[in-house]
A protein has these predicted regions:
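Glyoxalase I/VOC metalloenzyme domain signal
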Residues: 1-113
Length: 113
């Protein structure tokens, strides 16, 4: 199997350092729209199959899958017992050497995505 992102970072940059900076947003779609207007480049979006499988993976998530797909926003969390605990996230391309920004919106999920 492949190495995880932390192992890859350590190898590529010869040791420890800051990989990314996470910023929380109240409305990630509006945040993405504004950042896009400002010319912030984002990492490549997942394939369409990722969004096609959201309803199966997180039934009853209540998010607009097409709006997420158009922006490349990732959706994670759980919807067990009808209680949607979600994390929306997107990553900008590296801006400061290897450091990149992560933009997240938490809707009850406190995990890492």
């Amino acid at each position: 199997g492949g190495k995880g992102q932390i192992e890859e970072f350590l190898r590529a940059f010869n040791g420890e350092g800051i990989q990314h900076i996470a910023l929380i947003c109240d409305d990630l779609m509006a945040c993405w729209d504004r950042l896009q207007q400002l010319g912030v480049p984002f990492m490549t979006a997942p394939p369409p199959a990722y969004y096609a499988m959201l309803d199966e993976r997180l039934p009853g998530h209540g998010e607009d899958a097409e709006a997420l797909r158009m922006r490349g926003i990732l959706l994670d969390g759980s919807t067990e017992a009808g209680d949607a605990r979600l994390l929306l996230q997107i990553f900008a391309q590296p801006q400061i050497g290897p450091v990149f920004f992560e933009f997240i919106q938490r809707k009850g999920d406190e995990g890492f995505g």
